[in-house]
């Protein structure tokens, strides 16, 4: 237990004797190029990649009748995604699709909340771990937004009007 308390991720939590497979989580196998979930769908599960690779993509509206997929990142063994359903019931902000055959641990967010309520020391460490994952992703998103905004200003020659 001391090992878990020094560092806690969902991967280490899967090995916790009280966080039983079949009760709190289950394994799901995916073939390559298979959809895990779509942007806009509401989900109640958090995922850990046990093996394989997934791609995270978002819809970009080019015009009213044209859309394209933009690749945001790829995630690999041990990485986690879809954390937001733990905090709210908002739809997924991206589509996740497998790149290679994958085995995912699928964790019920409500059951995880109950487990962490009963184990607040683990809950604190897991939330801290999530902040270490989510903050770099947010920073990267901010950089991309700034770059695209700057590009848009230059493309429309608005940058020359700004003093």
Predicted regions and their residues:
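Cytosolic regulatory regions built on CNB/CRP/Popeye-like sensor folds
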Residues: 1-163
